[in-house]
From Swiss-Prot:
Protein name: MATH domain and coiled-coil domain-containing protein At3g58200
Domain MATH: 6-132
Coiled coil as UniProt keyword: yes
Gene source species: Arabidopsis thaliana
Entry annotated with the keyword Metal-binding: no
Length: 319
């Protein structure tokens, strides 16, 4: 991992075509007192046939429960033949205990990435530049020291995804319960059971055999439903973008989520109406203030007019 600036790093994935791991990780780097690293899926996630790329907070389990980082993220897959052809994607989001990872499932199609003389895969190397700007920080963290580790496949006790983005759990094993061959936490059993009771066919064509992929999909599903249950005041545009990413991931994974897609569209429409309503209210407040100013002006003019008119002249006044 080559540091180009305080918030800018370059990651070179070597021997790209011969990588056997489903996912690979960059070295760890530090920005905003958090330890981060990039995570890539060189073969894509399931059947989406795209190069997937995410930014992950590596030590989120050891951070205070109230930590948050509002982050501006720029991910650039470098075209080594022409900088103008590089693929750049940008987003802003809040990283926190529930969402310690964010990125793009479809950074670019694998056919484009691997194209001969395409410029992205040169000498079996793919180069990625990441820029991380911490816009706002909540929760006090201990100052982290920069650390690095070799690129490798990491063995995890669990691997989950939230809002379309993957996150790692710590190596500490938690109690888990099997619900329809999906491993969930005890606090999630009732909720997950209700989902399967209401929509028994939701995972009928889901074929992932590895438990960490099943867990990932279930956490995406729960996170999306949690987002849809937020009040419009709490719901942000970033939440809606994350909802779209989560829905895309679930559909790619083989989940039947037409009902969720419909609900998400309804919520997006309501959020749009709310924003339009807020804009109109603001305009009306301005108009009301103008009317109030005009009314006050009219009262002053009325007073002047009464003074001007005064009492009619008497005969004595005339003579």
């Amino acid at each position: 991992m080559e540091k180009e600036a305080d918030n800018k790093f370059r990651w070179v994935i070597k021997n790209f075509s011969s990588l056997g791991s489903e996912r690979v990780f960059s070295d760890i780097f530090v920005v905003g007192s958090c330890k981060w690293r990039l995570m890539a899926y060189p073969k894509g996630v399931r059947d989406n046939r795209c190069f997937s790329l995410f930014l992950v907070v590596t030590d989120f389990k050891t951070l205070p429960c109230d930590w948050k980082r509002h982050t501006r993220l720029r991910l650039n897959v470098v075209n080594q033949l022409s900088e103008e052809l590089s693929i750049l994607k940008e987003t802003q989001m809040w990283f926190d205990q529930k969402t310690p990872a964010w990125g793009f499932l479809a950074m670019l199609p694998l056919t484009e990435l691997k194209a001969e003389n395409g410029g992205f895969l040169v000498n079996e190397e793919v180069k990625i530049v990441v820029e991380v700007d911490v816009v706002e920080a909540l929760g006090k963290l201990e100052e982290s020291e920069e650390a690095t580790q070799p690129l490798k496949k990491v063995k995890l006790e669990a691997f989950v995804e939230s809002k379309g983005l993957l996150k790692e759990t710590s190596s500490v094993k938690e109690e888990i319960i099997d619900v329809n061959v999906f491993h969930v936490l005890p606090s999630q059993v009732e909720f997950v059971s209700r989902v399967f009771e209401r929509y028994p066919e939701i995972a009928s064509i889901f074929q992932a055999k590895k438990q960490h992929l099943r867990t990932a999909c279930m956490y995406v599903l729960l996170s999306l439903i949690e987002t849809l249950c937020k009040s419009l005041e709490e719901l942000s545009n970033d939440d809606l973008v994350g909802g779209d990413n989560a829905l895309q991931y679930l559909k790619f994974s083989g989940f039947k989520v037409d009902w969720l897609e419909k609900k998400l569209e309804e919520v997006k429409e309501k959020k749009k109406e709310e924003q339009i309503g807020e804009t109109r209210m603001q305009e009306m407040k301005v108009f009301k203030q103008k009317c109030s100013d005009i009314e006050a002006l009219m009262e002053r003019e009325k007073s002047k007019l009464l003074v001007t008119r005064g009492s009619p002249l008497t005969l004595d006044d005339v003579l």
